[in-house]
Amino acid sequence: MELLRTITYQPAASTKMCEQALGKGCGADSKKKRPPQPPEESQPPQSQAQVPPAAPHHHHHHSHSGPEISRIIVDPTTGKRYCRGKVLGKGGFAKCYEMTDLTNNKVYAAKIIPHSRVAKPHQREKIDKEIELHRILHHKHVVQFYHYFEDKENIYILLEYCSRRSMAHILKARKVLTEPEVRYYLRQIVSGLKYLHEQEILHRDLKLGNFFINEAMELKVGDFGLAARLEPLEHRRRTICGTPNYLSPEVLNKQGHGCESDIWALGCVMYTMLLGRPPFETTNLKETYRCIREARYTMPSSLLAPAKHLIASMLSKNPEDRPSLDDIIRHDFFLQGFTPDRLSSSCCHTVPDFHLSSPAKNFFKKAAAALFGGKKDKARYIDTHNRVSKEDEDIYKLRHDLKKTSITQQPSKHRTDEELQPPTTTVARSGTPAVENKQQIGDAIRMIVRGTLGSCSSSSECLEDSTMGSVADTVARVLRGCLENMPEADCIPKEQLSTSFQWVTKWVDYSNKYGFGYQLSDHTVGVLFNNGAHMSLLPDKKTVHYYAELGQCSVFPATDAPEQFISQVTVLKYFSHYMEENLMDGGDLPSVTDIRRPRLYLLQWLKSDKALMMLFNDGTFQVNFYHDHTKIIICSQNEEYLLTYINEDRISTTFRLTTLLMSGCSSELKNRMEYALNMLLQRCN
């Protein structure tokens, strides 16, 4: 039962033991005999740093446990004293103990290796190599190396203490994990592993027992006993090392260990988390190796399609067919599913409850009503152990089909023209919405109406508003007419207009808490709140426009807002300050204010896995593409439609749509126009 419990460090108890030990004098050993230990093979992996098996070694006495290690340990080089606590795990060469620095009560996981166990040169060389590799690593998701020292009896390696032990312990208690948990842990493993590979270090022993969990439920990749430098293919070592169930075909065939071999092990880890057993586990090792060489394993029907596809890609027999770490994190398994920002410690032994808090639940309740309202849905989206209402089922369905978009941000303070803060919960549509035309343009797009002006109490109010619908339909009709009739061309037309209009230069998705914020080119800041209300702070920073519904505008001073709007004005100012301080403009278009034009405010915004779409009250339509920061803006001026394209270098070009209709454009622009139209057409599906 001890293995099933979440182990939490209790400083008071350890300190008391240390005081008792100090009372007996430094170096005093406990004479109390230990109870017999079970065979090592019967224990799950526990150590913070597994050690390769040692060659047989014989003592005159204490042949199994070795000489007793002192309770108080002194570092000869610094004079620091440490108190040795309980055993955390054991490997071939060493045992891992809880160890407390008596000067500051900091707790470490100490790997203690008797000199007698590494007496042969090649054994000592392995320990030195592990220390050399591990001590240079510094990453949030890699077990931190702190210090090492030696005395006459032992070598001591002080590592980051992970109070909640390893993923092996969690899976032993839980049997299987839910998909959201697997995404949560895998993201962190991929992050740590990507760092290792960037340092040209192969782990070579990825498995549940080598992923350690700290007090905050953060995962750390540990155990560098088998780690090695990445070598060119022709110079790779042909040795077979690692844990049998996780070995890749190329390692078994002595073709060398590369980054792809770590990816294979990651596939085994994902499979084990979801199903509770490794993919190639059989009754004997010979059969296991045969299955691995043939990449032969069963894929239960209980797994959802994205999980099956990702596992299958990582367990490709040919190393070259396996995905990169970047490919893994961009896979539909991550993009289409809910990933919690954090996990409760209760997840170590209990299935988590991912029910939403009230504010977020209300937002999803509205979205679920809009998308699923009035439909009899007999499908089950919740595991049988969860008793939920139909409302919760719909909400879960939205969450389950979630898409989170990741944007690579520049390291500087002023990162990009747009920042995406993936909310704790995001919603997306899976499936393939139909477009009412024989020649559907582009592929179906997975997305969700993330923000719409006005109340969202029903689908008709939320998605079918006649004014909003007519704005969208007009833009879609014009864009579609251009795309379907313009000729093929290899380049962008030479005509370039010099004109001014308003467009979104910066945006922030903070819908996990408040709503969606944006800044226009005239420096107006707007927020479309989660409750459907819209608020704008004008460029003078003194005047606020508030829209509860389309066309219903209230105007008041920012410093003297009506009581019911004070909190929203505070949020509006927060968005304004954040974008001013942290984001830079997304293009080179001039910033001109035309007081004759109506005030722009956001009607609707949507996000897919590739782009953000924004539709405004005057028909201005903007689509920002995440991967290269290109943008398309369509607006009308003097009864004529204009299209502006901002390229990867933030250089803008503006055309009349009639010019594109006559001359055509490059495939680079056309593809983006098609995708933008598809988003617009599917906005209500």
From Swiss-Prot:
Gene3D superfamilies per record: Phosphorylase Kinase, domain 1 (3.30.200.20), POLO box domain (3.30.1120.30), Transferase(Phosphotransferase) domain 1 (1.10.510.10)
InterPro entries, alphabetized: Kinase-like_dom_sf, PLK2_STKc, POLO_box_1, POLO_box_2, POLO_box_dom, POLO_box_dom_sf, Prot_kinase_dom, Protein_kinase_ATP_BS
Residue numbers annotated as active site: D205 (proton acceptor)
Annotated region (Disordered), positions in chain: 21-70, 406-433
Compositionally biased spans, kind Low complexity: 43-52
PROSITE patterns reported for this sequence: POLO_BOX, PROTEIN_KINASE_ATP, PROTEIN_KINASE_DOM, PROTEIN_KINASE_ST
UniProt binding sites for ATP: L88, G89, K90, G91, G92, F93, A94, K95, C96, K111
Activity regulation info: Activated by phosphorylation of Thr-239. Once activated, activity is stimulated by binding target proteins.
Catalysis: reaction(s): L-seryl-[protein] + ATP = O-phospho-L-seryl-[protein] + ADP + H(+); L-threonyl-[protein] + ATP = O-phospho-L-threonyl-[protein] + ADP + H(+)
Domain of life: Eukaryota
GO biological process: DNA damage response, signal transduction by p53 class mediator; G1/S transition of mitotic cell cycle; long-term synaptic depression; long-term synaptic potentiation; memory; mitotic spindle organization; negative regulation of angiogenesis; negative regulation of apoptotic process
CC annotations in GO: centriole; centrosome; chromatin; cytoplasm; cytosol; dendrite; kinetochore; nucleus
Expression across tissues: Expressed at higher level in the fetal lung, kidney, spleen and heart.
Phenotype when changing H629A: Impairs localization to the centrosome and centriole duplication
Location of the protein in the cell: Cytoplasm, Cytoskeleton, Microtubule organizing center, Centrosome, Centriole; Cell projection, Dendrite
Record bears the keyword Manganese: no
Phosphothreonine modified-residue sites: T239
Principal cellular location given in the protein's record: cytoplasm
Documented effect of changing N210A: Loss of kinase activity
PANTHER family, alphabetized: SERINE/THREONINE-PROTEIN KINASE PLK, SERINE_THREONINE-PROTEIN KINASE PLK2
Quaternary data: Interacts with NSF; causing NSF dissociation from GRIA2. Interacts with CIB1.
UniProt function note: Tumor suppressor serine/threonine-protein kinase involved in synaptic plasticity, centriole duplication and G1/S phase transition. Polo-like kinases act by binding and phosphorylating proteins that are already phosphorylated on a specific motif recognized by the POLO box domains. Phosphorylates CPAP, NPM1, RAPGEF2, RASGRF1, SNCA, SIPA1L1 and SYNGAP1.
Name of this protein: Serine/threonine-protein kinase PLK2
